[in-house]
Amino acid sequence: MGSKERFHWQSHNVKQSGVDDMVLLSQITEDAIVRNLHKRFMDDYIFTYIGSVLISVNPFKQMPYFTDREIDLYQGAVQYEEPPHIYALTDNMYRNMLIDCENQCVIISGESGAGKTVAAKYIMGYISKVSGGGDKVQHVKDIILQSNPLLEAFGNAKTVRNNNSSRFGKYFEIQFSRGGEPDGGKISNFLLEKSRVVMQNENERNFHIYYQLLEGASQEQQQNLGIMSQDYYYYLNQSDTYKVEGTDDRSDFSETLSAMQVMGFRQACQQLVLQLVAGILHLGNISFCEEGNYARVESVDSLAFPAYLLGIDSGRLQEKLTSRKMDSKWGGRSESIDVTLNVEQAAYTRDALAKGLYARLFDFLVEAINRAMQKPQEEYSIGVLDIYGFEIFQKNGFEQFCINFVNEKLQQIFIELTLKAEQEEYVQEGIRWTPIEYFNNKIVCDLIENKLSPPGIMSVLDDVCATMHATGGGADQTLLQKLQAAVGTHEHFNSWSAGFVIHHYAGKVSYDVSGFCERNRDVLFSDLIELMQSSDQDFLRMLFPEKLNIDKKGRPSTAGSKIKKQANDLVSTLKKCTPHYIRCIKPNETKRPRDWEESRVKHQVEYLGLRENIRVRRAGFAYRRQFSKFLQRYAILTPETWPRWRGDERQGVQHLLRAVNMEPDQYQMGSTKVFVKNPESLFLLEEMRERKFDGFARTIQKAWRRHVAVRKYEEMREEASNILLNKKERRRNSINRNFVGNYLGLEERPELRQFLAKRERVDFADSVTKYDRRFKPIKRDLILTPKCVYVIGTEKVKRGPEKGLVREVLKKKLDIQALRGVSLSTRQDDFFILQEEAADTFLESIFKTEFVSLLCKRFEEAARRPLPLTFQDILQFRVKKKGWGGGGTRNVTFSAGQVNLAVLKAGGKTLTISLGDGLPKNSKPTRKGLAQGKPRRSAQAPTRAVPWASQGLNRNGATLFPRGEGPYTLEIYIWPQEFPEASTAIHLQPQDASRRPRARPPSEHSTEFLNVPDQGVAGMQRKRSIGQRPVPASRPKPQPRTHGPRCRALYQYIGQDVDELSFNVNEVIEILIEDSSGWWKGRLHGQEGLFPGNYVEKI
């Protein structure tokens, strides 16, 4: 079993594979670094930290930890909370940009094939996922993501070292609004390898788009573009390599076309782009032969198709490929001369035209992407630098020279900002520090780009190109001689017969000077520009906007000077941002997973300067910040600094650090900055800051939710009121109460939640009273969801290991659409009947208005029609047939009573309920009467004279008493301001004290026994004893037990429900409560329960 099967990469029990952060290595040597990287690589851990620098080893396979799950995991997480990951670095950049209001950039470096392009894709994908936004922002995100396949198709190719090598460099700026939404972007591209269009080395390919077009073109496109087999084209068959392992050119072509569409390319524009690509291929098939020392097109037929595709005359194409117009000056006069070319010059002209066409097409695509992402003004940005890696081939030419120069500049930035600048900053700020030695590659950069004293290689090259008009070997040999004279004694330069050697930071590279001057000139002859401007295609003419009739003064710019300027501009741009670094390592040359070449990796570790990086990081400080910036970021931690510190900034920083109890040895105060040593101390600050913001966010959220809830309650009350308006009397204490919905707290009641579907939303849940065929009250839990009504009861387990235990059981699950209607009376009672197909359900709930209103809403949503409601004072409900009889209907009659307490009287198949008058039927809730806060369930008043077990007791039989202070009198629970959900208890009009009615003598329906009794002297003594520690006393003698009223069983009775008492004949039962309904409560053998009063006689 492999390690991947035994351990999940993010489990807390994960296998420790080396160290996550190489600052923690016990030995700081190249060998120790390589061993740690190897150990992690073999266990599929491709990321490792050196402080904030991310080291990435190319696995050459798809890894499993780049899913949405990891995006959620790393979003907002502190760096060391989770294993090293590119998402952690990206999230850190994104959050710092928003918090510090500073532009960020990430510099991805490494040699060709080390995984830089893939890393850039993951960064863009993460940002796209975690940033919000509407349709416009989503469009920009799509452009950002789809620009990758488009630019890869036209700018990437297979090389000996990398199957998807970037043959151009790009700096991608993702621009953001102040809210962190990507709303724009900009791409800067550098030095496209144009020579690849016309020539490739062995085992290499041209740019991907050529192979995609030949493989994926439709039948119509093949006919229109003259598509043939790949080996037919000279620009493709030189290397005899057409396929790449693991690449599907046909599928990639579809992706490229899709990306074009996202960029806003219409179908006609896409066709013109592909037509130009095909035209370049056909142009390469024009060959030349010698005729009288001059070049002649070998086959005139080969001119027809490229001329057709480019929209030019085939005769003019032939003329411009075999001759050139040259301007000569004689004694102040200038004249144009047509010069006929030889075979070598004609082939050079053809290739120059092909390279020029492709380069301008590529620039057009980049500009089109930029236009699609353009925004009027820049706010914040994150830059991603994905540039060609350091390259060493068997034969290295001008392109490799430029590529390696740019990589040398990037290494210099890394050294400047992580090694050199850090140490210089400690000195400037007066921080105690031990200097660390490192190699500064500025000396190599100066060798290449110096202008004077001594001139660098590029300056010498430009000078040769300006003074030597000849092309070919003559100019190149002159270059070699001048280089020997100018920089021959430089310690990082050597020359040999055919070229020179530069000792780069990544090692020695031998360059062949053959073709250096030609490629550096990078001039497209004016004849060819005129030829393209004569095209009948607007698209092609747009690619050549030059005005040739205006004389150009000065020396034309060279490729070397352009790349030097671009490199220096790039450095300036990067230095304006807060930099982050990803150092990519290529583990092998085979491009196979789990293949590790020790010497190759060690060489990369050495030239990337990882050892020096670890030493500086260990000896230095993980975080440094200007006092003002530090105060701005962490001001929220103390009241004195929020919203801003009004005193000296240095003292403000010290106040913050003292407030969070940071140890003095964990930081140092410089002259303008504070330096924090360990990342853990920084994480402490960040965590406290997050908690503060979280607390404020919760406060705002709570206020907003309260506002929304109040508005929602008002709407629900209005809807409920409209259902009962002019049809049913209302209770004073319920008309203005809040609707809560879940009165049972189902989140903490798994025994009830088990009956519901997974993630089923609950609209209403409460304990209610159900009446059976004998009008016996039974406790039930009623739950309403968007689709069903659940009635849940309890039963005692009769067998098995849980015998005797009481368990919840599902008594009924009713589909809402199966309801036939709901019946209610016109009185102010709490009773309602759910009319079903087989048998009805007669229920009582003090929250009936809330339940019925929600039920009506859900029924209408499900059935697309209103729920039938019946309001009558004589109701019927059907009961299920049991055994030989017992089916049929039961009647419920409502009549006027003397008091507002419902009185129930059962007789045969009829239940009579009498109670006083309520508020008029046209009563509506008022805003003024809205009770604030959550209703207190324990303060509910009884609504009728029924056995205690079904209304005045909670689930375990204990009497419910109010939580409020003071005596529990009738005058308390009738006021809606105190107990908003009080039911139809005594109905009294609120009056002044002077107008209150005189006390009535107690009647058989008096509820004064519910009041809390007078505390008396015992209460006063109890209050005096609060806070005094009692003296331990001896155990008192047991008092003789006093007997209350008792009764003897005349018949045997077996309880039908868990709250009923079972007994045999002649057993004596202690009477606890006698109820006029005929159901008494008693105690027998230590158990309490209900029993029928007509089964016993008093003794």
Curated annotation (Swiss-Prot):
<dbReference type="InterPro" id="IPR036028">
    <property type="entry name" value="SH3-like_dom_sf"/>
</dbReference>
<feature type="binding site">
    <location>
        <begin position="110"/>
        <end position="117"/>
    </location>
    <ligand>
        <name>ATP</name>
    </ligand>
</feature>
<keyword id="KW-0547">Nucleotide-binding</keyword>
<dbReference type="GO" id="GO:1990266">
    <property type="term" value="P:neutrophil migration"/>
</dbReference>
<feature type="region of interest" description="Disordered">
    <location>
        <begin position="916"/>
        <end position="945"/>
    </location>
</feature>
<dbReference type="GO" id="GO:0005516">
    <property type="term" value="F:calmodulin binding"/>
</dbReference>
<dbReference type="InterPro" id="IPR001452">
    <property type="entry name" value="SH3_domain"/>
</dbReference>
<dbReference type="InterPro" id="IPR035507">
    <property type="entry name" value="Ie/If_SH3"/>
</dbReference>
<dbReference type="GO" id="GO:0043312">
    <property type="term" value="P:neutrophil degranulation"/>
</dbReference>
<comment type="function">
    <text>Myosins are actin-based motor molecules with ATPase activity. Unconventional myosins serve in intracellular movements. Their highly divergent tails are presumed to bind to membranous compartments, which would be moved relative to actin filaments.</text>
</comment>
<feature type="region of interest" description="Actin-binding">
    <location>
        <begin position="579"/>
        <end position="589"/>
    </location>
</feature>
<dbReference type="GO" id="GO:0003779">
    <property type="term" value="F:actin binding"/>
</dbReference>
<feature type="region of interest" description="Disordered">
    <location>
        <begin position="989"/>
        <end position="1045"/>
    </location>
</feature>
<dbReference type="InterPro" id="IPR010926">
    <property type="entry name" value="Myosin_TH1"/>
</dbReference>
<dbReference type="GO" id="GO:0007162">
    <property type="term" value="P:negative regulation of cell adhesion"/>
</dbReference>
<dbReference type="InterPro" id="IPR036072">
    <property type="entry name" value="MYSc_Myo1"/>
</dbReference>
<dbReference type="GO" id="GO:0009617">
    <property type="term" value="P:response to bacterium"/>
</dbReference>
<keyword id="KW-0505">Motor protein</keyword>
<comment type="similarity">
    <text>Belongs to the TRAFAC class myosin-kinesin ATPase superfamily. Myosin family.</text>
</comment>
<dbReference type="InterPro" id="IPR001609">
    <property type="entry name" value="Myosin_head_motor_dom-like"/>
</dbReference>
<dbReference type="GO" id="GO:0031941">
    <property type="term" value="C:filamentous actin"/>
</dbReference>
<keyword id="KW-0518">Myosin</keyword>
<feature type="domain" description="IQ">
    <location>
        <begin position="693"/>
        <end position="722"/>
    </location>
</feature>
<keyword id="KW-0009">Actin-binding</keyword>
<dbReference type="Pfam" id="PF00063">
    <property type="entry name" value="Myosin_head"/>
</dbReference>
<dbReference type="Pfam" id="PF00018">
    <property type="entry name" value="SH3_1"/>
</dbReference>
<dbReference type="GO" id="GO:0045088">
    <property type="term" value="P:regulation of innate immune response"/>
</dbReference>
<dbReference type="GO" id="GO:0016459">
    <property type="term" value="C:myosin complex"/>
</dbReference>
<keyword id="KW-0067">ATP-binding</keyword>
<keyword id="KW-0112">Calmodulin-binding</keyword>
<dbReference type="GO" id="GO:0002446">
    <property type="term" value="P:neutrophil mediated immunity"/>
</dbReference>
<dbReference type="Pfam" id="PF06017">
    <property type="entry name" value="Myosin_TH1"/>
</dbReference>
<dbReference type="GO" id="GO:0050830">
    <property type="term" value="P:defense response to Gram-positive bacterium"/>
</dbReference>
<dbReference type="GO" id="GO:0032956">
    <property type="term" value="P:regulation of actin cytoskeleton organization"/>
</dbReference>
<protein>
    <recommendedName>
        <fullName>Unconventional myosin-If</fullName>
    </recommendedName>
</protein>
<feature type="domain" description="Myosin motor">
    <location>
        <begin position="17"/>
        <end position="690"/>
    </location>
</feature>
<dbReference type="GO" id="GO:0003774">
    <property type="term" value="F:cytoskeletal motor activity"/>
</dbReference>
<keyword id="KW-0728">SH3 domain</keyword>
<feature type="domain" description="SH3">
    <location>
        <begin position="1042"/>
        <end position="1099"/>
    </location>
</feature>
<dbReference type="GO" id="GO:1902624">
    <property type="term" value="P:positive regulation of neutrophil migration"/>
</dbReference>
<feature type="domain" description="TH1">
    <location>
        <begin position="728"/>
        <end position="917"/>
    </location>
</feature>
<dbReference type="InterPro" id="IPR036961">
    <property type="entry name" value="Kinesin_motor_dom_sf"/>
</dbReference>
